[in-house]
Swiss-Prot record:
NAD-binding protein involved in the addition of a carboxymethylaminomethyl (cmnm) group at the wobble position (U34) of certain tRNAs, forming tRNA-cmnm(5)s(2)U34. One of its GO terms (biological process) is tRNA methylation. The lineage of its organism: Bacteria, Bacillati, Bacillota, Bacilli, Lactobacillales. GO terms for cellular component: cytosol. It comes from Lactococcus lactis subsp. cremoris (strain SK11). It holds the Pfam family GIDA. This is tRNA uridine 5-carboxymethylaminomethyl modification enzyme MnmG. NCBIfam families: mnmG_gidA (TIGR00136). HAMAP family: MnmG_GidA. It comes from the Bacteria.
Amino acid sequence: MNFQENYDVIVIGGGHAGVEASLAAARMGSKTLLMTINLNMVAFMPCNPSIGGSAKGIVVREIDALGGEMGRNIDKTYIQMKMLNTGKGPAVRALRAQADKDEYAASMKNTVSDQENLTLRQGMVEELILDDEKQKVIGVRTSTGTQYGAKAVIITTGTALRGEIIIGELKYSSGPNNSLSSIGLADNLHEIGFEIGRFKTGTPPRVLASSIDYDKTEIQPGDEAPNHFSFMSSDEDYLKDQIPCWLTYTTENSHTILRDNLHRAPLFSGIVKGVGPRYCPSIEDKITRFADKPRHQLFLEPEGRNTEEVYIGGLSTSMPEDVQFDLVKSIPGLENAKMMRPGYAIEYDVVMPHQLRPTLETKLISGLFTAGQTNGTSGYEEAAGQGLVAGINAALKIQGKPEFILKRSEAYIGVMIDDLVTKGTLEPYRLLTSRAEYRLILRHDNADRRLTEIGRQVGLVSDAQWEHYQAKMAQFDREMKRLNSEKLKPLPDTQEKLGKLGFGPIKDALTGAEFLKRPEVHYDEVIDFIGQAPEVIDRTVIELIETEITYEGYIKKAMDQVDKMHRLEAKRIPKNMDWDKLDSIATEARQKFKKINPETLGQASRISGVNPADISILMVYLEGK
């Protein structure tokens, strides 16, 4: 085969999955090519101008802990930072940043361009080149006929695969934001034999900032207290001059406009064929599914410091443009707003994810990986997490090293990938805290403690990041030791001080850690009694200490559950397993096992339609092998 150039890894698509995949592979020493349809759309945000949020924010922290880029990049380019769910327990707290979308993309493009071992090139890949047996990928062919050789290929094409934009009765071939649609590659994947699904997502109108009457909306400022996505970011760099978002609502008039035009809605007229996201429905879907609600929240989100475009979060729609004009003007604060871009729906092809291994390598073609919305997920963060895993595994495969699989107990990224490859998805998949059975372990504050050592082992965590992490953990250990040794004694002055703070008296001496276990007590109050540490304790260390001590009992119970699950995960299933030999299992279980081909007993136990009796039979069979 005649190749123009040869690479270790070729990544197709420069979105959020593609940049993480290519950076990971290159940083691990693989000669990498990132091919993208448009160099001006690297890490572009075609929908909401934000990073993080519930569950998603924890994923960004996990990406950072493993040595990925998304957290570092948003810390350089945000216009607002906010910790969500602060009134709830630590398991559901998550960080969200409003991004300067142009700065975010430009900064990430610079990072990619400057990365050693990584070549960024504009071009459209139309075909995968396979070996003579049609079992292994060996390169790609572009629309210009140029052929590039590769030992591994990662497809991260987002919503571009046979993408079609829909606005009212208008439907035309396009990727996101009127970029080119990738039709040749979509056809090629179908020809190779992949099962292809058709999904849909959408985006709301954008309006001119200067045409908004903010007096009719509620200001939503960022946090004054510093927070960051990257564990390497400094509190000294926390942005003081933040830009607020604004809250408004739909009205009864908004709903009337929508109801009167539902017959023109592509979602209901049959124009939209793809399956849409359950957890991010269009406004026309909302007023139909939740007809009893008098109004729906809308967030006016600035798209950056140097643009007048404002994103109307919560108003995703593919209604005809004339309906969108009327709809926007029915919203308080937007009566005189000038619409800059209409909302639209986009349909696209997906590789149904049950065809993937937990490494995100396809079962059908060796060396071929897929990640991001190509796999049926929604969201920049979910895409980036998958891209990182695919990039790591592509590099490891080439190096002949053990594969990288995150467990459900180790990361939300692990939960997501296990859900995708074990259960599959029939709609755009979104990460939720409720999907994680070990969410008290998978917290925002301990992502580095969970994953930095793993990232170091695979060769992605830099020396600087590793030293920073080790210093933090050493301080954590020293302060935990001090809190478990220094005591509050039931002396008169201690009792008086406790009373002034609103705490009851103590009968026996308590260690600082025992006092901190009380739900109403915080670290600063413990220090009032046992004194300051001989060093300045980092804010993030204090946060970790408070959670680990306060919830120690619950965390221990969760870890006991993890140990039980790990025993199931340790039982491997042979790759060439003959499922027909299991005579006693239910027919549905046999069919599911054949389709998913689980790799461990633990994975088999999580397949929908498989009951405990089937797992017991499988366990007995494996133990007899």
